[in-house]
Each structure stands twice: as structure tokens, then as C-alpha cells.
């Protein structure tokens, strides 16, 4: 089984090609608020307190409907902080469900209740829950809050008791691969697979709070070794085949061919890592913002536009590394990903 082609994490190459031909969308990522009940030391958005003039329910619904009209099939509820701190999150989920769109929510799990988990299951919401470590001290340190491990484990248990993963409702555990948890990655991966849970394990991008904790990041050679071991485990134990490449184990990022992000103040940007606003949905329709953006055009044509050293790589046309990592490390979203081990001659890391 080719895991990437069958995984619920992405879209098929054929679907992406059709999206590019019609210059549309397949998904949109939404941030609701910067408010968060954790203070993760690697948080890309430095979430904590909410911002002024964050999007209203009406504005969020409008973005979702505009995305649907542009061809989006999936809405990814990132939160920006913790999505379940947004007071109207249940109305957002109901609306997406009524439109017949797929939806996924990324949560730290701390606010989950039995009732909420049943609601998510009933509305066919895919859930990705934070899960960086099985050790309380490590998880709490990474989350920046005492007791985080206990709350996360409780949330995971409640999701599984509600029926996840099952009946077309995938459950993911999300982890950043870093120095503190590198020895836990393989056992957590195996545990997830054995329970039908999708492991969403990604390398660290040095942005936000992670800039103050750059020692968290592992060198590319070590990330490569970890990903290769995970690939071998999947092949030998679970019959799943995928090629190890950054930035996510078992999954190649292709979101820049079909997606964008709208943050909690309405600014549109390519992804969480490329913090370059290309417009604001309070001033222009989403479709117009995307059509008029050179940045989006560059990224839709990434395999032609990317740094020359990547275009001659044997993996050119299949992989573009992490564009967010490239931008955060170099200031150029078309630069080679300095954490990529596939590109010949790459020895630099994002930990200068």
C-alpha cells in the first residue's frame, strides 16, 4: 500500500492537478484566535492572549463559503491558538458540516469533554491532538504549562471513547520531533499505528517561540535517520510504503499547490510558516486576493520557481521541502529548505 496516496492527510495528484488547471482551492486553513491555554515553547504563532479585532463568526462563515465556491473540499481549523477557546467554534463546525465539506481540527485536547467529543464524532470532524511525549515532565515542559500531559491524555482518552478513530473519522496525534522526545518517536509511532491512529510527526520550524529555544531542533541527518526508521517500521510491520522526506514523516507537503491560510485578523498568507500577508478578507474577496498574488503564483509553480539546487535534485517534481522553514531561515520562500537532507550538498541546519 502506498501510504501517501491512500492517506487521509492529503489529496491525490490527479485532484491537485485539476485544482491547478482551474486555479482554485482544495482546502483552506483557518485561525480563529491567538488565545491559548498552553504556552508551547515551540509555538509558531506565540499564542497566548487574543488579538484585537479578531474575526467574527459571520466573517469566518463568509471565508468558508468563499473557499467552497473556489472549489475547497476541506476546511482545516488550526485555531491560531486553541480553537475550542473561540466562543462560536461549534457553530463553525455545524456550518461546515451542513455545507458537506470535510473538516479537521488541531487541538491540544485540554478542553475536550465527553459531550464535545460526541459532537465532533457526529459532525464527522477529523481530529489532530497534540501528543509530544508520554512522559509528564517532557510534555509539560514542551507545553509550557504544568499539568498539560494529564489534560492531553484525558482528551485523547475521551476521543477514543467517543469512537475515534472509526467510521470515517480519522484521529491523529501531532508531535514535533525534537531533542526532548527523539527517543520516544518510534514507540509513539508504533502505538498510534496499532490503535488505528495516524501519527502526524513533523520537524520543528524555527519561528515564533522556537526562536528562543533553537536548541530544540535536531540536525537534518538525525531527522533523516528517524524518518528512515519510521518508514522501515511502516513497511515491515504495517505494510505501508512511503519515502522519507522533510518536513512530515509519511507525508509530503503539497499544500502550496492548493491551499492558503486565513489568520484571526483576516490576513491571507500561504501557510503558517510563510508570514507574508497577501491581502485581507475584510478588504477583498478571497478569490481576488489569491488571483492577484505573485506569491501564490510562485508557489503554485513551485517546481519551476524553486532554487536551482532543488530543481536538479533527483526528487525534483515530487518534493519541495518545507517552504515555511525555507522562508524563516533565509527570508526567501523559494529558497532551498536548509533542513532538507535530500538535496545534494545540503549541510546547513536551521540552528545557527
Listing of model-derived features with the role each one plays in the protein:
Residues 1-9, 55, 69, 99-102, ...:
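Radical SAM enzyme [4Fe-4S]-AdoMet core and its adjacent flexible, acidic
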Residues 2-126, 218-219:
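Conserved alpha-helical substructure of the radical SAM core
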Residues 30, 34-37, 247, 265, ...:
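Processing junctions and N-termini across compartments
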Amino acid at each position: 500500500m502506498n501510504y501517501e496516496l491512500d492517506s487521509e492527510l492529503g489529496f491525490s495528484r490527479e485532484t491537485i492537478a485539476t485544482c491547478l488547471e482551474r486555479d482554485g482551492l482544495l482546502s483552506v486553513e483557518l485561525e480563529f484566535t491567538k488565545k491559548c491555554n498552553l504556552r508551547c515553547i515551540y509555538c509558531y504563532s506565540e499564542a497566548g492572549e487574543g488579538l484585537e479585532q479578531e474575526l467574527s463568526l459571520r466573517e469566518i462563515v463568509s471565508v468558508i463559503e468563499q473557499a467552497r465556491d473556489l472549489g475547497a473540499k476541506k476546511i482545516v481549523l488550526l485555531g491560531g491558538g486553541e480553537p475550542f477557546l473561540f466562543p462560536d467554534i461549534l457553530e463553525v463546525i455545524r456550518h461546515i458540516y451542513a455545507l458537506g465539506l470535510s473538516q479537521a481540527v488541531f487541538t491540544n485536547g485540554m478542553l475536550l469533554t465527553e459531550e464535545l467529543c460526541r459532537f465532533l464524532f457526529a459532525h464527522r470532524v477529523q481530529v489532530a491532538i497534540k501528543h509530544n511525549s508520554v512522559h509528564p515532565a517532557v510534555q509539560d515542559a514542551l507545553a509550557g504549562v504544568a499539568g498539560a500531559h494529564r489534560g492531553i491524555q484525558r482528551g485523547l482518552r475521551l476521543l477514543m471513547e467517543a469512537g475515534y478513530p472509526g467510521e470515517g473519522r480519522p484521529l491523529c496525534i501531532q508531535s514535533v520531533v525534537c531533542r526532548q522526545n527523539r527517543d520516544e518517536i518510534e514507540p509513539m509511532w508504533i502505538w498510534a499505528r496499532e490503535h488505528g491512529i495516524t501519527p502526524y510527526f513533523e520537524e520543528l520550524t524555527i519561528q515564533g517561540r522556537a526562536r528562543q529555544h533553537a536548541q530544540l531542533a535536531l540536525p537534518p541527518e538525525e531527522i533523516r535517520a528517524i524518518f528512515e526508521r519510521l518508514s522501515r517500521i511502516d513497511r515491515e510491520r504495517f505494510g505501508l510504503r512511503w519515502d522519507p522526506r522533510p518536513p512530515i514523516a509519511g507525508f509530503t507537503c503539497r499544500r502550496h499547490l492548493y491551499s492558503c491560510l486565513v489568520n484571526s485578523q483576516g490576513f491571507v498568507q500561504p501557510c503558517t510558516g510563510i508570514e507574508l500577508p497577501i491581502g485581507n478578507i475584510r478588504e477583498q474577496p478571497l478569490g481576488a486576493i489569491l488571483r492577484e498574488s505573485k506569491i501564490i503564483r510562485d508557489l503554485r509553480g513551485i517546481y519551476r520557481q524553486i532554487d536551482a539546487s532543488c530543481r536538479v535534485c533527483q526528487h525534483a517534481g515530487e518534493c519541495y521541502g518545507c517552504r515555511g522553514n525555507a522562508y524563516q531561515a533565509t527570508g526567501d520562500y523559494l529558497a532551498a529548505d536548509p533542513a532538507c537532507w535530500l538535496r545534494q550538498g545540503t549541510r546547513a541546519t536551521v540552528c545557527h
